[in-house]
Amino acid sequence: MGQKTHPIGFRLGVIKDWPSKWYPPKKDYAKLLHEDLKIKNYIKKRYKVAGVSKVEIERIVDKVRIKIHTAKPAIVIGRRGQEVDRLKKTIERMLPGKEISISVLEVKVPELDAQLVAEDIALQIERRVSHRRAMKRAIDNALKAGQKGVKVQVKGRIGGAARARKEWFLVGRMPLQTLRADIDYGFATAYTKYGILSVKVWIYKGDVLKGGKEEILKKIEEEIKQAAKEG
């Protein structure tokens, strides 16, 4: 039976970075891991309507830096920064004795963020929109923005069927085993009266090389063609 690897975890340390950065003693590892999960789940739940894509946490001695990537930063920041100040005080109570700093970063194109796309499809399914329509719309939006490939999968008791099944659409390329391939991945859950449906989204954005993005490859190809013409 084939085993699936997580597209982001598979590329950590190669072209992807860790969402949590800290180096604790072995005895503190589990404690800090649970603290991170608690903070991330709390922020995602508190700002569900803000479209929070991911939360990054960095710890340096007694300082904790939190980066919130969201499609609607105004909701997280609040009027004159009041909301983000309230969030900071709440997290300070969760982590007593720590110096907390929070930065809010905008996701400029939510249609290209796999996590936000997955959550949007799940929300549409909960509102009884056809799953196929939601999936195809998400794929069309990503391809119009110039992405190389998109895959969307929905699994569960689709449409209230007696048996669970999965449906998926793939348009373009999706090189899952190529480490230099920049693949964004998102997962969401849709709660319906028939049960739970899982939604997974993969977006292939092109290849990443040590020197930069895939434009380097294009430049090399152009130089080779030019040299061939001159030769």
From Swiss-Prot:
Biological-process GO terms, alphabetical: translation
Domain of life: Bacteria
GO MF, one example: rRNA binding
GO cellular component: cytosolic small ribosomal subunit
Protein's organism: Aquifex pyrophilus
Pfam families, per the entry: KH_2, Ribosomal_S3_C
Record's keyword terms, sorted: Ribonucleoprotein, Ribosomal protein, RNA-binding, rRNA-binding
All residue ranges annotated as the KH type-2 domain in the record: 39-108
Protein name: Small ribosomal subunit protein uS3
Family per record: Belongs to the universal ribosomal protein uS3 family.
Subunit structure, as described in the record: Part of the 30S ribosomal subunit. Forms a tight complex with proteins S10 and S14.
NCBIfam families on file: rpsC_bact
